[in-house]
């Protein structure tokens, strides 16, 4: 087992990708490692000969088909949606399946500069020998254009407008000019860009209309029902636990259902049976947070408990997930405990008591 804390998609699922490449008989777009059909199988699950391909995305298959079809054309892809809807996860796996490399990535922030998108210089070499290819520091976009592969741009709306504007010419002209060297580097076939942006947390600046026109936009929804969300959570928690030393068994169906029920009710503003309205806290309570909560509960159970995730283990995680704005969220959580959870019956009694004890501290 690798000692790396987190493997890339192509490393984690290397055997699946090898099996798909071996069995793939469909035509491949130039620069692609797999055909569009094989990419779809990798993302949504299926078979590659005798090898089972686990689904990386559980949801509307048609959305994935649209994503793949977009990347076949010369259009860039923009994945948007609520936080925790697997935008980054999907972009990484699309890049891994199509190019065999998901490591060409720019993390957007208020500090991202145009040089990080185009190129910069090794200033020691620049001062000693002037502009040269050896002194040129290529950005992930430059490397992707040069090799004809996918590049990922995370949280594009967190970048300043002038940085976003630099993308417009790159996506329109599909080339990078380096006037200091008198070269004009065109993108090789196979190049495309996959960007992500949150709809809830819009970041520093919204995208301009000109930049939006350079993308095909796909909105990734939250899981449509509790069973779908439980399936996603169970699969991802299982994958994470296989490389984390939690010393705990996977959380049982009863525990997972409780966590997802609470998250969905608070997130949607009503109980699952639609009979009672509830107030929503300031936090997102996304599927990704549920996965993190359950993984942390496994660590608690393995290190300080019986080795099996209990109501007491998830209670601490629930309070931390719900209460972000101390006063307002604490009141919302208290009302939910007393008006909803308390009335759910004896199966929920232990969790209710554990949550109330923590709320008093």
Name each model feature, range by range:
Residues 214, 232, 296-300, 317:
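A general alpha-helix detector
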